[in-house]
Structure formats: C-alpha cells, structure tokens
C-alpha cells in the first residue's frame, strides 16, 4: 500500500512539474509570437495558429499537427517546393522578415513589363499597325531633314518636298548614304568647303604660286572662274572645264578699229543726208509753186469760172496780141 501511495505521489509530482513546464513554454512562445517571432522547427513540430498581431482578443491555442502520422505528407515536405508568386501576406499568416520578402520579390517580380512585352509580341493587327505607322512617319521626317539640309529649301520648297514624300508610297525605310558632291562631279581647280561653299584657285605657270579666285555658291560658277583665269594665263593651250565656251570663237576686234569704222559710217551717213536734203529742197520749190496755183484755181467757185454764164453780160474789147505788136512797130517807124 505504501509503495502504491508513493508511486501515486511521484506521478502527481511529475504531472505538476510537466504542467508547469508546459505553462512556461506556452508563456515563452506567446512572448515570442507577440514580439514578431514565430516557431517553426519542422513539419512535425508544433505551430501557433491565430492572428499575427499581439493585440488579438482571441486566446491562442496550441494545436498538434497531424503531419507526423502521414508518411506521404512528410516525404512531400522533404522535397523542396518552388516559391509561389503571391505575396507573403496572402501565402503565409505569419510575419516574414524584410530580407525574405525582398528576395521573393526579386525572384518573382510583379511588374507590368512582362505584360507589355506580351502585348508587343501579340498578333493583334491594331498593335502591329501602330508601330509600323510611327516608324514610317519617323523615316519621312529623317528624309525631309536630310534633303532640307542638302538643298537648303525655302518654306515653299519644304512644303513641296513634304507633299512629294506623302504622295510616294514606296519610300525606303533606311536613310540613303550621304555622298559628297565631289564624288559625282569633279572640276579642275575647284574644291568644296565643309560648310557647303565652293572655292576656286589656280597656279600661275611661272612661279607656281596659287592665285585665289574666290568663293562661290555652286561648283559651276567656281569652274567658270577657273576657266576664265586659265584662258587669260595660258591661252588656247589651257586645260579648261568648259572648253566649248572659250575655244574656237572669233577673236574680238580692237577698239580703235571699231572707232574708225563708226567714224566712216557717220561721215557717209552725213553726206547722204545733205544730198537728200538738197534734192528735197529743189523738188520742194517746184512743188510749192504748182501747189499754190492749183490752190488758187480751186478757190474760185465753179459759177465764177471762165465758162460761167455770168460773164455774158459784160462786153470786153477783144484784141489780138499780134495786132498790138504791129501797131507799136508802125508807130515807132513813123517817129524815126
């Protein structure tokens, strides 16, 4: 009997000691949970279930997981599970340190870049047309800027170029390579500055020094200036850019010869003018007399003419000129 009582006392003491230990463990775990820590020693360990905040009104209950009794679940816990893409607040009811949260976000970012990339790769016709149209407009702007810089277009020329680019449907997608003007047309004694102007210069045949001819807007003007100076220095043996404009042409007549020719022509014209004036005066005198007589006769009215009946009432002595002459001669002879 005594031994049985002693055994019962020892069992009670052990039970009370175990209960005290359990209470201490519960207090310790509660303190850890309230301070932000959690206990997770493995799949077969004890877990706390409840709210993550220490101010939860519900009492925390300690439950024993039943995973240790299922060997299949234990083996599944042994295999590594891939991390989920959801956030920690949704996946776990426990507080995770910031380092683990940042690591999960870094491994599985939740940004819309992937969605944008999927939208760009998708075969939606609207999404394919928009980038193509934008690229075509950009190419047109590049071409317009290129030709405007080369041709130095005015505002009207710029509008014409824009209309031409709009009308053309088969525009090249790449900008044509820039070719210098010197590669297309070369002139002797002409070179181009890097800002677009053209200069001309020539070497003198005697001392081989360079003679500056000037700066020009076009290569043709500079080539003409070189040809003029080369023709002056070397004559017909000069190598010119435009030989058809200078060679095989009539030599210009001297100035004094032109003056002599003009003097002789002026003298001849003056002499001819004098002769014409004298003949005109002679003819003019006769013509004036006849014209005056005709005008006098024309001024007499028709009824006063010689055949008019008005003269019948007047009796004029009719005399002959011969009789008058004879009478005068007879009278003169009598007196003698």
Swiss-Prot record:
A Pfam family the protein falls into: AP2
Location of the region described as Disordered in the Swiss-Prot/TrEMBL record: 1-60, 247-280
Principal localisation: nucleus
GO biological process: ethylene-activated signaling pathway; positive regulation of cellular response to heat; positive regulation of DNA-templated transcription; regulation of response to water deprivation; response to salt stress
Subcellular location: Nucleus
Family: Belongs to the AP2/ERF transcription factor family. ERF subfamily.
Description of how the protein assembles with itself and partners: Interacts with RGLG1 and RGLG2.
Protein name: Ethylene-responsive transcription factor ERF053
Lineage of producing organism: Eukaryota, Viridiplantae, Streptophyta, Embryophyta, Tracheophyta
């Amino acid at each position: 009997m005594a031994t049985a009582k002693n055994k019962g006392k020892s069992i009670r003491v052990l039970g009370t000691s175990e209960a005290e230990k359990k209470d201490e463990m519960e207090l310790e775990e509660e303190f850890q949970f309230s301070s932000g820590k959690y206990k997770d020693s493995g799949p077969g360990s004890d877990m706390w279930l409840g709210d993550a905040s220490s101010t939860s009104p519900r009492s925390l209950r300690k439950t024993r997981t039943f995973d240790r009794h299922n060997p299949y679940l234990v083996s599944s816990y042994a295999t590594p599970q891939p991390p989920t893409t959801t956030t920690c607040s949704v996946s776990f009811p426990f507080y995770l340190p910031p380092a683990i949260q940042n690591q999960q976000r870094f491994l599985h970012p939740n940004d819309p870049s992937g969605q944008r990339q999927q939208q760009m790769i998708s075969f939606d016709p609207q999404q394919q047309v928009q980038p193509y149209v934008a690229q075509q407009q950009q190419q047109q702007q590049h071409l317009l800027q290129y030709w405007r810089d080369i041709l130095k277009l005015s505002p009207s020329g710029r509008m014409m170029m824009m209309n031409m680019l709009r009308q053309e449907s088969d525009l090249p997608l790449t900008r044509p390579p820039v070719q210098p003007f010197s590669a297309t047309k070369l002139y002797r004694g002409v070179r181009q500055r890097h800002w677009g102007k053209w200069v001309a210069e020539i070497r003198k045949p005697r001392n081989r020094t360079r003679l500056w001819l000037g700066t020009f807007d076009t290569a043709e003007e500079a080539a003409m200036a070189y040809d003029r100076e080369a023709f002056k220095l070397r004559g017909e043996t000069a190598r010119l850019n435009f030989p058809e404009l200078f060679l095989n042409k009539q030599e210009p007549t001297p100035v004094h010869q032109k003056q002599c020719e003009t003097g002789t022509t002026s003298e001849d014209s003056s002499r001819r003018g004098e002769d014409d004036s004298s003949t005109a005066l002679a003819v003019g005198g006769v013509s004036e007399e006849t014209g005056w007589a005709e005008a006098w006769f024309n001024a007499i009215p028709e009824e006063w003419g010689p055949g008019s009946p008005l003269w019948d009432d007047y009796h004029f002595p009719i005399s002959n000129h011969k009789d008058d002459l004879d009478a005068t001669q007879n009278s003169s002879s009598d007196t003698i």
